Swiss-Prot record:
Residues that, per the record, bind substrate: K57, V58, S59, T109, A110
Residues annotated as catalytic: H153 (proton acceptor)
The protein's role, per its UniProt record: Catalyzes the conversion of cyclic dehypoxanthine futalosine (cyclic DHFL) into 1,4-dihydroxy-6-naphthoate, a step in the biosynthesis of menaquinone (MK, vitamin K2).
Chain coiled-coil ranges: none
Organism: Streptomyces coelicolor (strain ATCC BAA-471 / A3(2) / M145)
HAMAP family in alphabetical order: MqnD
Homology family: Belongs to the MqnA/MqnD family. MqnD subfamily.
Name by which UniProt lists this protein: 1,4-dihydroxy-6-naphtoate synthase
Pfam families: VitK2_biosynth
């Protein structure tokens, strides 16, 4: 591994493999080489807090804890509309007051959106929060081990297969109350890489996104290799939902959404407050 190689971790989900395919396979001229580790977002959040690797895909929820050492890239992440986490239940109109809810992580953006939704809509609050691996949540709700489950990503397209009902869409609630897109996943890189390297990396990520859009079939082998037996049509839906203009560039609305989420979460005591320049790049 050359000194120029960056160690990166992102998830095996189709949006990440689609975005990074060209970059990971040396098809972006002048870009740094990548040494890729696949890890779920709960793992990468922990890596960020421990200062591991050079570049990570993390939850926006972890940013307030790590931005002293890590810079938020203005591209490569996941924001969008109509793509928020869902709360699923066995019964169509379940009351979640005092009920047990399974979540994939307590340091995820989905969890922040859920807590903000619950603060607005569940008088007295929900009951016990149980953290469990993402793939176990829908079966646990179906089997009555928990009263409700918070799910993300492809579960939007598959929850009916488990006989479950959508109680609420966290993204709809967020969009309705703020008018902003839903911040989900961020790309961060070590500030110690220095401004020139960070800028070069951001340019390379943007080029990788554009390459994937220009020739979607080129990324398909990489996407499907890591898509955990996902139906190709579901993988395409997943990419269509999570890879969008905010992936190429956060822009004004993207930054407003991130700052809005983290400011509101800080006001609820869920995360530390952000400094005024915390989101600046590089």
């Amino acid at each position: 591994m050359s000194a120029d190689t960056l160690q990166i971790a992102y998830s095996p989900c189709p949006n990440d493999t689609f975005v990074f395919d060209a970059l990971a396979h040396g098809r972006v001229p002048g870009a740094p080489a990548l040494d890729v580790t696949f890890a779920d977002i709960d793992i990468t959040n922990g890596m960020a807090e421990r200062g591991e690797l050079d570049v990570l895909k993390v939850s926006y929820a972890v940013l307030p804890y790590v931005l002293d050492d890590w810079a938020l890239l203005p591209c490569g992440g996941a924001l969008g509309r109509g793509c928020g986490p869902l709360v699923l239940t066995r019964e169509a109109d379940a009351d979640l007051r005092g009920r047990t809810v399974a979540v994939p992580s307590e340091t995820s953006t989905a969890y922040l959106l859920f807590r903000l939704w619950a603060a607005d809509t569940v008088p007295g609050g929900v009951g016990e929060i149980v953290v469990m691996p993402f793939h176990e949540i829908m079966p646990a709700v179906r089997d009555g081990k928990v009263d409700a489950g918070l799910v993300i990503h492809e579960a939007r397209f598959t929850y009916q297969n488990y006989g479950l009902h959508k109680l609420a869409d966290m993204g709809e609630h967020w969009e309705h109350t703020t008018g902003l897109p839903i911040p989900l996943g961020a790309i961060i890189a070590r500030r110690s890489l220095g401004a020139p390297a960070l800028t070069r990396l951001a340019d390379a990520v943007r080029a990788s996104v554009r390459a994937a859009w220009d020739d979607p079939e080129a990324s398909r082998p990489y996407v499907m290799e890591h898509a955990q037996e996902m139906d190709p049509a579901v993988a395409d839906q997943h990419i269509g939902l999570y890879v969008n203009e905010f992936t190429a560039d956060l822009g004004e609305d993207g930054y407003a959404a991130i700052r809005g989420l983290l400011t509101r979460a800080a006001a609820e005591g869920l995360v530390p407050a952000l400094g005024p320049d915390a989101l600046a790049f590089p």
